[in-house]
Swiss-Prot record:
Homodimer. InterPro entries: Dihydro-acid_dehy_C (IPR042096), DihydroxyA_deHydtase (IPR004404), DiOHA_6PGluconate_deHydtase_CS (IPR020558), ILV_EDD_C (IPR056740), ILV_EDD_N (IPR000581), IlvD/EDD_N (IPR037237). Mg(2+) binds at residues 81, 123-124, 491. HAMAP family: IlvD. It comes from Bradyrhizobium diazoefficiens (strain JCM 10833 / BCRC 13528 / IAM 13628 / NBRC 14792 / USDA 110). Signal peptide: none annotated. The gene is ilvD1. This is Dihydroxy-acid dehydratase 1.
Length: 616
């Protein structure tokens, strides 16, 4: 029987000092026999997805204590990728994932916590906490702050749903008036919550449902709706039950590595492909699998991408569908239900809220559930009132979207595409692979060939696109923006948005060793591995070189002879210490970022750190 970790600090004569300190936090004699649960919050006023979380940690804490545990809350950092976008602030986004994972490990291990409730929401926070939970392998439950409501704007007599990406594209489009830009800007992000499309934050919160570590609705019910409060309440009770099952009943099945096992990672990636999730999820799932010692790799993602269809299309892949609409269609359990009927997922895996995924779907899939409460839950709708307050409205749709032929979520027979929403491409330009969000690529450019236009930074690419240096038919190549070369592997949301605003969204491709925001769409191919800073062939591309992209056949080819590439490589390596570095940019790289660059690995491995372990 495993011993409660917390008893290291709460039991025994020699722990009198530690108990004295625990007492100073409010603990009483009776509390020293209870499990201590870490409530990992990520409240900050910098991020709309986290601005409403301040009191929610204490909501969970109260429920933990009512269920017989002791709750102790702490905070992690949280970076807003949208605010950090387009300047050197984006260098810090991906590295913050490692800091978040480390901070959770430090706090949980330093204080010997018995379990975790992870309150996350935005882009790197959910992945960082997921990595920590799998690294620590103590009972854990995830609950997110929830999606933002989509904005509504009336232009030219028509009302349309808008989001952050619409504001960015409109601002860069000279044909849109200043007044219209201002109207869109003021409407794009109306409430607290993670940005309203199937961007990285919402994608990851959806995937925690598929991994079995979060409660149904975690990824889809909007932050403002009263129904989301139930998730926080249930998380508090659920974690105490899981902790007792592990420490008192020796039930190791509840541990994160046994819940989020290889089959669960396959399920999560299958969901991601079916809903056209953010390409960043590939990076984060690989990193989480690494922490959980799960042998899940790019090869598995490639294999799954070849057999999973697109059953759901959400912004930015389509303009008028947001995560709130997915919730009305049955949420993530609705999509998983269709994948189950198609024989594409393994429902024998366990979850933190049901013995198996099959049991969970029996209750939560609206196409099979007999529960009126479940159907009512999935009718939770946006309130339509700007607010930063969680659980502030109780509006509901009159009816569910259960149409699997033409609705937001489709069945296999009526799939948007038989080919999946994400694909892994290989070739001499990406020997270890690269990622494209096929759900956001127009069918007319699934095969594309054109001359390269090379830039050594995102900033230079933006200047080139807006300055008219990029023309239709070209492949924009942005190099030295990978995990090590950036460092930090910046998101390229501005270049993709500006290609759209310049009328080149369907006329150009963009290829980079950096990554893309979940808000990016178009023929945007990222994560090229090996990256330029590691000596990858992408660092040998020259303006004018022909690049051929063939998504149906999963290939990306630099049409330059092996002999010429060898000459270029020899010339580069002759530079010695100055080799494989950007020469045409000035960038202030802090000590913190230099430390990250020294330890990080390629995108094909999730950009995890590689540290030589000392033998003790």
């Amino acid at each position: 029987m495993p011993a409660y970790r917390s008893r290291t600090t709460t039991h025994g004569r020699n722990m009198a000092g530690a108990r004295g300190l625990w007492r100073a936090t409010g603990m009483k004699d009776a509390d020293f026999g209870k499990p201590i649960i870490a409530v990992v919050n990520s409240f900050t006023q910098f991020v709309p997805g986290h601005v409403h979380l301040k009191d929610l940690g204490q909501l969970v804490a109260r429920e933990i204590e009512q269920a017989g545990g002791v709750a102790k809350e702490f905070n992690t950092i949280a970076v807003d990728d949208g605010i950090a976008m387009g300047h050197d602030g984006m260098l810090y986004s991906l590295p913050s994932r490692e800091l978040i994972a480390d901070s959770v490990e430090y706090m949980a291990n330093a204080h010997c916590a018995d379990g975790l409730v992870c309150i996350s929401n935005c882009d790197k926070i959910t992945p960082g906490m997921l990595m920590a939970a799998l690294r620590l392998n103590i009972p854990a439950v995830f609950v997110s702050g929830g999606p933002m409501e989509a904005g509504k704007v009336k232009l030219q007599g028509k009302t349309k749903a808008v989001d952050l990406i619409d504001a960015m594209v409109a601002a860069a489009d000279s044909k849109v008036s200043d007044e219209d830009v201002k109207v869109i800007e003021r409407s794009a992000c109306p409430t607290c919550g993670s940005c309203s499309g199937m961007f990285t934050a919402n994608s990851m919160n959806c995937l925690t449902e598929a991994l079995g570590l979060a409660l149904p609705g975690n990824g889809s019910v909007v932050a403002t709706h009263a129904d989301r409060k139930r998730l926080f309440v249930e998380a508090g009770h659920t974690i105490v039950d899981l902790v007792r099952r592990y420490y008192e009943q020796d039930d190791a099945s509840v541990l994160p590595r046994n819940v989020a096992n290889f089959k669960a990672f396959e399920n999560a990636m299958t969901l991601d492909i079916a809903m056209g999730g953010s390409t960043n999820t590939v990076l984060h799932l690989l990193a989480a699998a690494h922490e959980g010692q799960v042998a899940f790799t790019m090869k598995d993602i490639d294999r799954l991408s070849r057999r999973v269809p697109v059953l759901c299309k959400v912004a930015p892949s389509v303009a008028d569908v947001h995560v709130e609409d997915v919730h009305r269609a049955g949420g993530i359990m609705g999509i998983l239900g269709e994948l189950d009927r198609a024989g594409l997922i393994d429902t024998s895996v366990s979850t933190v809220h049901a013995p198996t995924m099959a049991d969970a779907l029996e209750r939560w899939d609206i196409k099979r559930s007999k529960s009126e409460a479940v159907r009512t839950f999935y009718r939770a709708s946006p309130g339509g009132i700007p607010t930063q307050v969680a659980f502030s409205q109780e509006r509901r749709y009159d009816e569910l979207d259960a149409d699997r032929e033409k609705g937001v979520v489709r069945d296999l027979e009526h799939a948007f595409s038989k080919d999946g929403g994400l694909a892994v491409l290989y070739g001499n330009l990406a020997q270890d692979g690269c990622i494209v969000k096929t759900a956001g690529v127009d069918a007319s450019i699934l095969k594309f060939s054109g001359p390269a236009r090379v830039f050594e930074s995102q900033d230079a690419a933006v200047e080139g696109i807006l300055g008219g240096k990029v023309v239709a038919g070209e492949v924009v190549v942005i190099i030295y923006e990978g995990p090590r070369g950036g460092p930090g592997m910046q998101e390229m949301l501005y270049p993709t948005s500006y290609l759209k605003s310049m009328g080149l969204g369907k006329a150009c491709a963009l290829v980079t060793d950096g990554r893309f925001s979940g808000g990016s769409s178009g023929l945007s191919i990222g994560h090229l591995s090996p990256e330029a800073a590691e000596g990858g062939n992408i660092g040998l591309v020259r303006t004018g070189d022909l690049i051929a992209i063939d998504i149906p056949n999963r290939s990306i080819t630099l049409e330059v002879s092996d002999e010429e590439l060898a000459k270029r490589r020899a010339s580069e390596e002759a530079k010695g210490d100055a080799a494989w570095q950007a020469t045409g940019r000035k960038r202030n790289v802090s000590t913190a970022l230099q430390a990250y660059a020294a330890l990080t690995t390629s995108a094909a491995r999730g950009a995890v750190r590689e540290v030589k372990r000392r033998s003790n």
